[in-house]
Structures are given as structure tokens and as C-alpha cells.
């Protein structure tokens, strides 16, 4: 996860992970490129400074600008897909990541209410081990309560999306190292009756939130500290 005020720091002082660990993050880059070339230049510098193996990105408004940016960043490649409203994708280090496949899921009309932006799967290898990454940008907003059965309720739509994703992973990748990440637009600290992630939290032997300590910690470390909110997650 990356804080929205990361660029205010000295990028030369940023350090994450090691050369022998799979280092990844999720980043809503907000209507990319929101400020045109200034955004492209800033995002490029941040990517190179962080040296992540994989970055899952959301809110790509211009996929052409995204592709052009990726061509200018040494040692990195990217994949983005624009749906009806804002795109998502992955940025990855070509020296450490080998791509097996990239594809969308839940594109049929029956899933549109739960997935306004179709999740993207990246089937990849890192150090000869296979990993499945699924980037998401779930429906936003709501009132903090799950109105069960109400297909217009934002929390219900997110809860259903999470349940569908879990079933997909359990069925399609029962033994693979699978990671669900992205802007999931809800809190993991809500009470069980209002928690859209409860189906995940109820299965601790198979799933955990890598950012759980961030979510329960001070708001200054949250993914959107100026709101403040922590709606971006990595589920392993």
C-alpha cells in the first residue's frame, strides 16, 4: 500500500523489501493522468524510486498515456484495461516477474452490478514460483450498513463481490499462491454484521489481510490519510 502523500517525502530515502522477497503494492493513482505530463513524470519517478516487483493500479483514465509512460520506465512493463469507467492494470519489474497470462474475469452482464470494473488476473512466476494476483476496484460509497438483498445498496454489492471472488479463488486456485488486492472501498475493521469482508475474515486458515496492522493503527499510516480512510487492501 502507498500513502497518497508519499511524493511529499524525499524519494531517495524510500526503502521497501529486499532482493529476495516478492514486493508488491496497490495504488489508486486517481484519474491518471489527472494533471497531464506532470502526473506522468511524478508517477514515473515514484515507480523507479520504490523498485517494487509488482504494482496493482486503479483509476487509469487514459490507457494510451499509461502505455506511453511505461515505455519510458527502464526495467518495467505494464498492462492496463479500460472498462466503461476507469481502468485498472499492473506494473511489473521485467527482471523478476515472468508473465504466464493476463486476463479479465466476471465480464458477463450478470456480474456488472457487483463488479463495475472487471477484475484483472495476472498469472505470473517469481523465482520459479507461480503466483496469481487479482486486482480490483470495487463499488464506492454507502452508509456503512449492509442491506441484504438490496442490489442497489453499495455495501451489499461489495459484500457480494468479495464472496464471488473468494468462491472463484477457492475453486480455480485452491493450492496456488493467490493474492487479491486493490481499492476495495471498505473498511476491514467494521463490526461483523456490517463488514463486507466477513466471508474472508471467517476463513483465517486460508486468508489474511497483509495490511491488517495498518488498518487498526493510526490514521497517518492509512492509504488515504488526509480523508482519513483505509480502503485499499492486500489479501493473501
Residue ranges and their predicted role:
Residues 4-236:
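Divalent cation-coordinating acidic motifs and surrounding scaffolds
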Amino acid at each position: 500500500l502507498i500513502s497518497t502523500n508519499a511524493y511529499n517525502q524525499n524519494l531517495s530515502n524510500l526503502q521497501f523489501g529486499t532482493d529476495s522477497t516478492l514486493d508488491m503494492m496497490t495504488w489508486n493513482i486517481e484519474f491518471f493522468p489527472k494533471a497531464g505530463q506532470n502526473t506522468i513524470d511524478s508517477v514515473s519517478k515514484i515507480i523507479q524510486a520504490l523498485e517494487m516487483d509488482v504494482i496493482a493500479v486503479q483509476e487509469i483514465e487514459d490507457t494510451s498515456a499509461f502505455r506511453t509512460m511505461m515505455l519510458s520506465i527502464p526495467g518495467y512493463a505494464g498492462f492496463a484495461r479500460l472498462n466503461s469507467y476507469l481502468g485498472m492494470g499492473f506494473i511489473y519489474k521485467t527482471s523478476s516477474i515472468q508473465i504466464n497470462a493476463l486476463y479479465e474475469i466476471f465480464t458477463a452482464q450478470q456480474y456488472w452490478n457487483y463488479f463495475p470494473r472487471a477484475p484483472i488476473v495476472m498469472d505470473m512466476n517469481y523465482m520459479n514460483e507461480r503466483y496469481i494476483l487479482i486486482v480490483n476496484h470495487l463499488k464506492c460509497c454507502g452508509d456503512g450498513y449492509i442491506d441484504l438483498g438490496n442490489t442497489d445498496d453499495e455495501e451489499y454489492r461489495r459484500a457480494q463481490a468479495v464472496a464471488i471472488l473468494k468462491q472463484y479463488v477457492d475453486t480455480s486456485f485452491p493450492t496456488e499462491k493467490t493474492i487479491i488486492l486493490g481499492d476495495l472501498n471498505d473498511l476491514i475493521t467494521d463490526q461483523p454484521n456490517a463488514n463486507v469482508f466477513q466471508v474472508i475474515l471467517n476463513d483465517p486458515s486460508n486468508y489474511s489481510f497483509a495490511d491488517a496492522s495498518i488498518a487498526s493503527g493510526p490514521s497517518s499510516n492509512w492509504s488515504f490519510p488526509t480523508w482519513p480512510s483505509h480502503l485499499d487492501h492486500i489479501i493473501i
